[in-house]
Structure formats: C-alpha cells, structure tokens
C-alpha cells in the first residue's frame, strides 16, 4: 500500500490507496446536509477492490498459506475483486482462477483475461452463491489451490480499518457525521466503520442494498442490475451490528443516479456508485441531517460498465452514428 509521497512507486502495490474526496454539488437539490464522494475509482485498477486484492494475497503469504509460482489462487467474484486479485497475481507470479456470474459486464471478462486469469462463468440466476459453489468445486480438484474467500476473510475489513478509515478521517479533519457504502462483502463499511467509530462513537454508518434483493432488511434474495452489491446473503465479514440503517435503492434509481453523476458532476462511475450516491442524497435531504457531512464511497469507474445497462442507450446511439460528408 502506498503513502502520500512525490516519490516514484517501486511497484504497482504502492499505488493503492490515498484516493481523493470531492464534494457532490449538482445532484444535491433539496439537500440540507453535504456529501463528499470517496473516489475509489481512482485506484490503479479503478476500484475499491484493489485494496483487498492486495491485503488478502499479502496476508496469505505472511501466514505461509500460498507461494508464488506454486499456489493456484481461486476466488468467486462479481468482477472487481477478481480484477483486484488479477493484477496482484500478475505482479506476484500466481496462477489465478475466478468464477463469476455471467450477468457481469463484458469489460470485466476482458480485463480479467488481460491479466492472465482463468475465468469460469456461472449461472446468473444463482448469483454469487452459484459462483461460490463453483469455486469450491474447482478447488476440490485442483492441487496446491487456495480460495481467498473475500466474503469470510478478515483481511478484507482489516485493510479498510488500516487505510480507508484513516484516510477519510484525515481528509475530513474528523468532521464526518456519516459514512454511506454499498454492501457487497461488507468489508468496506465494516473496516472503515470500526475505525471511524473508534475516533467518534457518534459517526453514523449507512449500508446500501438493492431493493430487489434486500436481504439485510429481511427481504428475499433476487436478481438486480447493481453489479458489486446485493450478493443475496449476509457475508461473514459484515458486522451487521455496526449498521445504523441499510437503505434500499432500486436498480433503476442507481442507474439514473450514475448517469446524472456523469452529466452533472463530471464523475464517470459504476452502477453501485449510483446506488450509494442516491442513498447519500436521500440522507442529506432529511431535516435532522441539516449541516451534517456524509462521506459516500464510490467503488468503481464507469468505463468498466460501457457494455452494461448503464450505457445501453448511449451505446446504441454511438453505434448508429454516420460519417458526416
């Protein structure tokens, strides 16, 4: 992990972390509180999962569980964790096999293969549970293999406790009132939230999940379009007792908010960032939150979603363009 410094990084791992925060200014009509976005889209591989790609591999190495050039790493992913692991595996010399629901974007498939990962697609109707099961099947027949288990691995929230939390606390000069984060594995909000609560017990922690798969609110798992959150089960690394509230955002609202962030704020982000922003704006409109500062995590860059429903209409428009004489 890197530290803020003008020096040249020794390798790509030193580029991870220390992402900037920026105020949301144009999608905030009716808000009485303020929102700052933590731009994890500016990680070296464009997502918050770069942090846990680094932490889970490094932790396993330090414990003697894996060895470069010998161990085969296996992991179920919705895409971004896979990419975070893939660039680390390439840099360190590991073979990596990933299982991923076929509903995830084409960009994810291409990027994973560009880093040399072996990719196995699973039934999209089975969601992440199907990807997890397939990963376990592959491990059972693969010698020298190791599943990193992002949904259960303590190294996931630990890296956010050690880096994301302190970064936010420092950037806001300790004036943060609430953290808003979409919940995939739950590692970001658990680790970051623990650190922030230790600094100020009054900091509120707000999760975000798809309304179509509102498991944390007692609902049933279901298909949705917000890639990266709403796994359909409660992950082991998520500390649900930390959460003050988990807001529900529909796929359509997440998509429209992500589009608005590009058009009004100049921020090209993914669908889960749209979901988190929609939740943050909703919170900032509540009268009791007047004058309060929310930090909302934007997990990934929008270019990873060009083939997805997020840019479907624009893609069709671009494809139908003709050359002007």
From Swiss-Prot:
Superkingdom of this protein's organism: Eukaryota
PROSITE patterns: CYS_SYNTHASE
Residues bound to pyridoxal 5'-phosphate: 80, 184-188, 272
Reactions listed under catalytic activity: O-acetyl-L-serine + hydrogen sulfide = L-cysteine + acetate
Keyword line: Amino-acid biosynthesis, Cysteine biosynthesis, Cytoplasm, Pyridoxal phosphate, Transferase
Cofactor(s) required, per the database record: pyridoxal 5'-phosphate
Subcellular location: Cytoplasm
A GO CC term attached to the entry: cytoplasm
Leader sequence residues: none
Matches recorded under Pfam families: PALP (PF00291)
GO BP terms: cysteine biosynthetic process from serine
Main location: cytoplasm
Gene3D superfamilies per UniProt: 3.40.50.1100
Positions where N6-(pyridoxal phosphate)lysine occurs in the chain: 49
Pathway(s) this gene product operates in, as recorded in its UniProt entry: Amino-acid biosynthesis; L-cysteine biosynthesis; L-cysteine from L-serine: step 2/2
E.C. numbers: 2.5.1.47
Keyword Ribonucleoprotein: no
Family that this chain belongs to: Belongs to the cysteine synthase/cystathionine beta-synthase family.
Subunit structure as annotated in this protein's UniProt entry: Homodimer.
Full protein name: Cysteine synthase
Organism the protein comes from: Zea mays
Organism ancestry: Eukaryota, Viridiplantae, Streptophyta, Embryophyta, Tracheophyta
């Amino acid at each position: 992990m890197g530290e803020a410094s003008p020096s040249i990084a020794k390798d790509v791992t030193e580029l991870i972390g220390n992402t900037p925060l920026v105020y949301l200014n144009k999608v905030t009509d009716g808000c009485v509180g303020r929102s700052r976005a933590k731009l994890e889209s500016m990680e070296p591989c464009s997502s918050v999962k770069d942090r846990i790609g680094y932490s889970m591999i490094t932790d396993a190495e330090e414990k003697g569980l894996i060895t470069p050039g010998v161990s085969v790493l296996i992991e179920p992913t919705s895409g971004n964790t896979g990419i975070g692991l893939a660039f680390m595996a390439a840099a360190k010399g590991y073979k990596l096999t990933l299982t991923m629901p076929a509903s995830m974007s084409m960009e994810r498939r291409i990027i994973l293969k560009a880093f040399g990962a072996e990719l196995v697609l699973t039934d999209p109707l089975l969601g992440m549970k199907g990807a997890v099961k397939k990963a376990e099947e592959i491990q059972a027949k693969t010698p020298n293999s190791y599943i990193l288990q992002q949904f259960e691995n303590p190294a996931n929230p630990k890296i956010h406790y050690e880096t994301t939390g302190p970064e936010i606390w420092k950037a806001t000069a300790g004036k943060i009132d609430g953290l808003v984060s979409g919940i995939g594995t739950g590692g970001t909000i658990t680790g970051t939230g623990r650190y922030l609560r230790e600094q100020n017990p009054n900091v509120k922690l707000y999760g975000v999940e798809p309304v179509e798969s509102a498991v944390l609110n007692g609902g049933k798992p279901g298909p949705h379009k917000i890639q990266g959150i709403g796994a359909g089960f409660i992950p082991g690394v998520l500390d649900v007792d930390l959460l003050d509230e988990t807001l529900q955002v529909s796929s359509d609202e997440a998509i429209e908010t992500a589009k608005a962030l590009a058009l009004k704020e100049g921020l090209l982000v993914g669908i889960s960032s749209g979901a988190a922003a929609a939740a943050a704006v909703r919170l900032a409109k509540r009268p009791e939150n007047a004058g309060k500062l929310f930090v909302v995590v934007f997990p990934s860059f929008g270019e990873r979603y060009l083939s997805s429903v997020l840019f479907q209409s624009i893609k069709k428009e671009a494809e139908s363009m003709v050359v002007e004489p």
